[in-house]
Amino acid sequence: MKIIKVTVVYALPKIQYICQVDIALGSTVKDAILESNLLNLTNDVSFHHNRIGIYNKTVHLKFKIKDGDRIEIYRNLTIDPKEWRRNNVFLSKKLKKIY
């Protein structure tokens, strides 16, 4: 049985979890996440609430991983992107009036 190396990452605003995992060839994304123990390190990670990707491309939990893959666990958005842009434009206009 061949062993491959993958990285499982989860980033919060102030801390990043980066776990190197040695796992059997033919394993899935879910297997690698379970092997990384990230589910026990933080309460923010859940298979039901977080999207998963490899190199910024969303994949399913049953996706077969390859040697060198970086499995990324994405956080849920805290604010709608349109709302954030509206707030940002409003603040920048307000600052221009002050200066």
UniProtKB/Swiss-Prot annotation:
Protein name: Protein RnfH
Source organism: Buchnera aphidicola subsp. Acyrthosiphon pisum (strain Tuc7)
Lineage top rank: taxon: Bacteria
HAMAP family for the chain: UPF0125_RnfH
Annotated family: Belongs to the UPF0125 (RnfH) family.
NCBIfam families xrefs: PRK01777.1
InterPro entries: Mopterin_synth/thiamin_S_b (IPR016155), RnfH (IPR005346), RnfH_sf (IPR037021)
